[in-house]
Amino acid sequence: MLVDPITRSDLSIFHAEEKFSVFNRLNFTRTDGGREELRQLFERPLSDRLQIEQRQQFLSHLSGVLDQWPNRISNGTLHVVEKWLEYPLDPIAENTASLSNLLYRWLHPADYSMIRYSLPHLIDLVQGCNQILGLLQSFRSEHPLQPELLRMERVLKKSELKQLVSADRSTRTSLLTSLQWARITRYAAKESLHELLNLYYLMDAWYSMARATQELKLTFPIFRETETPYFQANQLTHIQLEEPVGYDLQLNQQHRLLFLTGANMAGKSTLIKSIGIAVYLAHLGMG
């Protein structure tokens, strides 16, 4: 779908005052990074029918597991992980039982405190993503070419992260185990964790789209291959109205003209925008 900035502005997909934007109405993300990913998805509506229908299928499947979505990954969790990956940590010896490591807690107290604080959040990220993969297991088997899910699965299967996948968050780790995991996450698995962060932000955006579809009771549209333009909607409403009145509309070769009349503020512009927003959301793969 090709859309210019003026049309996007006329539909209030985005707005300088967030409360007036369609994006804000549909934003159910839990993280700052997820919000940015969702915004990028909204800026790039799809044009290919197959891609749209695949996203519809994915969001439909996701809607069925929203209540099981892990809560352990919060916005704060991801901020801690991001800070950890960039933190100027003093070196940790490769030999876990070296003297410098045994004395690390006393020689580098600030860094050791950062390690102790960050590790639970790293575990939450890794194990939370592993839970998400479990929730989407059936979708992955039915659609093996879903690239983002395959990337997440590949990252979590890497040997460096396996210890975090199986770690017990409630058990306090020893000094040497903490240093071992700190070294792994800062060196061997650093790029993997960056990739996992970005993948989770995308998952958060998808979660938001599925949650919005469910919460606002949106209906996935059906696309048909026709030689002429065609549009039909039953009980179409404007997504931002609290108590909307639905309209049945049909535009095709037999019904080529929609004539609107009425007093000022009767809702003519709102109805026109409703049609535009419905078409826009349809090309995002939403209802």
Question: Where are the regions a protein language model picked out?
Answer:
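Alpha-helical coupling/stalk and coiled-coil linker elements that connect catalytic or binding modules
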Residues: 1-266, 270-287
